[in-house]
From Swiss-Prot:
UniProt-annotated stretches for the region Disordered: 426-488, 513-558, 648-699, 727-757, 796-830
Gene label: PAM1
Annotated Low complexity bias: 513-527, 538-555, 738-753
InterPro entries: 6PGD_dom2, KPA_reductase, KPR-Related
Biased composition (Basic and acidic residues): 807-816
Biased composition (Basic residues): 817-830
Pfam families in the record: ApbA_C
Signal sequence extent: none
Keywords tagged on the record: Coiled coil, Phosphoprotein
Top-level division of the source organism's lineage: Eukaryota
Protein name (record): Protein PAM1
Organism per entry: Saccharomyces cerevisiae (strain ATCC 204508 / S288c) (Baker's yeast)
A GO term from the CC aspect: cellular bud tip
Comp. bias (Polar residues): 433-444, 651-699, 796-806
Similarity comment: Belongs to the PAM1/SVL3 family.
Amino acid sequence: MTSALRVLVCGDHPNLILYTSRFQHAKNIEFYLVNNSKNANYEVSSLFYGTERFQIQNHFQSLLDLVDLNNENGGLVFDLIIMSASSLQEIPQVLRDIKPMMNKTTKILFESSGFIYLEPFIKASVDLSLSNIFSIFTDYDIRRLDNGSYKQFTTANAKSFSVSIGQTTSVHENSYSSDIIPILNTFQKLFQKLFPRDVVTLYDHSPSAFLAKEWELALPQICFDPLLIILEEKNPSTLDDHVLAKPLISGLLGESLLIIKKMGIAMNNPNFQNEQTILKHWKNKCEDLPDGPALLYNFIHKASSLNIDLLLLQPILLADDFGVKTPYLECLFTMMTQYQLLNKGDSEWFIRKDENTALTRVDDLQNSIALKDGKIMQLQNSESTLKNEIKELQSQVLSLKQEVSSSKANNGQELEILKKKVQMGDNSLFDRPNSNTNGISPSDNIVDVDLNYERSDQGNNSSGNDSRRQSFFNSTSDTTLSRDETSLKERELEVRMKELELQERELELQRKALQQQQQYQQRPPKQVYSGPSGTPTSGNNNNKSYNPNRKSSYSQPQHVAMMTSRGLHGPSAASSSPVISANNFVDPVSSGTPYSSNSSRFSQQIPSQQYMHTVKPTSRKNRSSVMPNIGYVPGLTNNEYGRKFNGNGMNGTQSRLNSLSNQSTFRSQQGPPITQQKSFQNNGGSMRTNRIPSANYNISNQQSGFVNSISSPNLSNLENRNTVQNSRNADSAPCVNQLNSDSPPQLQSLSQNGTSKVPQINITQPSPIQTNFATSDNPAAVIKLGTPSEDTVSAAATANNISTMGDESRKEDVKEKKKKKFSFFGKRKK
């Protein structure tokens, strides 16, 4: 089985499409086509073979694409190459590109219809053997109509067409060499199969006969067709009527015939003997052609290349080789080259007039007008759409303005309401601390007792709450109308939260007061105070036992008189009902509620007499003392009890109270102890007080509290001489204040039990010293140094009874120390 014949057709000449169409009917052929057509589908119409439509599988728009394919795959070698060129410079370039795809047996057929003697030029371009280069031409007039469509132009009475294959190796040779003839015979057989209705001729293997046939086809195209373009003549029959055409025709034909003669070619055809016969034969051939010769057709329709180099330059080069002067041919070549540039639109000064140009321009203008009209319609539609959108937006703006105005009005009303609420809240908050919370009327002119009523749930957060409340007042006072609705709502919520917080605190105070009232109502009966564990007894240090029925060293009337005079410093116990404040808080001082304790140390009942001897008279007779009292205030766990003297309670209207009369008597006991110190106000002399040492309590029975001691540099002698020990309730933590000579009084806390509550101690001084204690778990204890409160008077009564016990144990030293003064009144120096 023989391998397929690999054929390459390369070029843009219309005759190559004719050959391609005929190769599609051959078998066992691998066909490749390279041209500038963008479409691989073709249609060819001919007189004998009709219309043929075909598609090329191996189609390439340029020769470089084929070269790239060969570089990728490799091994692509063609057996036959049929090629054409538009200029002499293109021939060597094409041959160099396809040379890698050629071998020694590759045959080249160059399209030479209208051209002469190109084989020597091809051989000189590349190093190829002349035996492999041949020429092919035909009398078919194939013209390109449009892209991919070709048609044969001919007369209707044509009988046959010819295809000629040969070689022009030497002008003077009459026959080919023995190696060329078999190749030509093979070509003849091949093309005879491709063109069965045409004549494939070799001209009896005569190179001179083949060259003479080339001149017969090329002579009219060289001398007459270019003149039609130059003289702008479409009808060949009237060309010789031009005055300028006759000398040009004569000059061109004379030079061409001279070249033929120099080449030794005999023109045996009677139609090509002289100028008249050649012109007549040309007119007869072009008479039946509707569009004139092919060169004029290609110039007018710009269908194909004019091939000016191959058509005119090659005869000039031949004439130069044979020593023939060709001025007409050279002038014609120059003019046709410029016309070719003008036809392509490459001229800088001239432009071709085209009949279709005006129509094309009109069509272009109409198309542009239609496009602009379409754009105008689109713009109008978009304009109407935008207008509708503008109307909608304007309506939305109006509605939004109405909403804004209404919202402004509503916000203004809400702002006024919030301002009123804030003002009412401010007034209620500032008026509430001035309200009467302890049951004592403002007309009592209470100035000497500090009553610290505080909420038990406040703790260390009291200062934080005050700061937050103050910041809230500042923030509410700075409210302006420029705040938006969100800030107004936030402030309204904040005000409501503050109001709820105040209401919760008020309810908590009422609950605490109610619990306190129930606690006072559920107190056990009065018990005898036996003194703390450190009190001297018969079994301790040989001290004399304490006699509770000890006779008073002064008479009852004197005692009553003294207590009457001292009633200015204490509350009244004659009131039968306790005083209840606005928060249902029972004032234990003014109510005169007796002291009660659950401690196991009070093992004895107090005797039937109501009052103990509280103060031992001094040597200054029954002179009433104007010294301030030092009282003891127990903690919340020890309950409150009033101070009574000789059965006659102090009148509440005569009580002197210092400091805060509107505060709650219970302070929240949270946080670490905070010492507050007030300046001493001199009420008649310096304070002289006895040292109160802490009792010797058992640690197992002792609850958490505070241990304070009080000392003074003025009492150094009294400290050495006074050994009286005063005890307090064992249920409360002991508190002893000590005044150091080096530093001001300090309060030191010893927290022993987190669950115990801290007592309150009020010690009479010329001016009050207020001290707050706080722990993390217990409410803060409040220690106030100043004029005794009602609690202090009650605590002082018990303390005076204890001091009387100490006096009974030291009867033997009365005479020696008769100028001394006991109980809580310090020694008064003259």
